[in-house]
From Swiss-Prot:
Pfam families on file: AdoMet_dc (PF02675)
Assembly, per entry: Heterotetramer of two alpha and two beta chains arranged as a dimer of alpha/beta heterodimers.
Domain of life: Archaea
Catalytic function, reaction form: S-adenosyl-L-methionine + H(+) = S-adenosyl 3-(methylsulfanyl)propylamine + CO2
GO molecular function terms listed in the Swiss-Prot or TrEMBL record: adenosylmethionine decarboxylase activity
Protein's recorded name: S-adenosylmethionine decarboxylase proenzyme
Active-site positions on this chain: S63, H68, C83
Biological processes per GO annotation: spermidine biosynthetic process
Species of the source: Methanococcus maripaludis (strain C5 / ATCC BAA-1333)
Keywords, ordered alphabetically: Autocatalytic cleavage, Decarboxylase, Lyase, Polyamine biosynthesis, Pyruvate, S-adenosyl-L-methionine, Schiff base, Spermidine biosynthesis, Zymogen
């Protein structure tokens, strides 16, 4: 069996309100998370909502990291999806924790693109 991608979904509860509404800080966190997992950054795009909240995505050569925040609930939802053997999505978590300071994190692991090895055309 071969796995084409590794995908983690993060549920981040009890985060710092100010961090969840800090668009430049979230952009920096995304860049730091990309570096931490060994991925290749293509670009970062974020949007600040009124009155609060930020959504953002780091587009990677290997896929993406995304975030959507609810400061009023102290909650953030994140996806880290990577392809390739050299990238480790779980390595993003310390950078995310350092910035958002969640009280609780739920991590769901998804193996993407499971195929039989003999199906892979080299």
């Amino acid at each position: 069996m071969k796995q084409l991608g590794k995908h983690i979904i993060l549920e981040l509860w009890g985060c710092e309100n100010q961090a969840l509404d800090d668009q430049p800080g979230i952009e920096k966190m995304l860049v730091d998370a990309v570096k931490a997992c060994g991925a290749t950054l293509i670009c970062v795009k974020t949007h600040k909502f009124s009155p609060q909240g930020v959504t953002g995505v780091a587009v990677l050569s290997e896929s993406h990291i995304s975030i959507h925040t609810w400061p009023e609930l102290r909650y953030a939802a994140m996806d880290v999806f990577t392809c390739g053997e050299h990238v480790t999505p779980h390595d993003t978590i310390p950078e995310i924790q350092k910035f958002l300071k969640p009280e609780k994190i739920d991590v769901m692991d998804i193996k993407r693109g499971i195929i039989e090895v003999d199906e892979v055309k080299e």
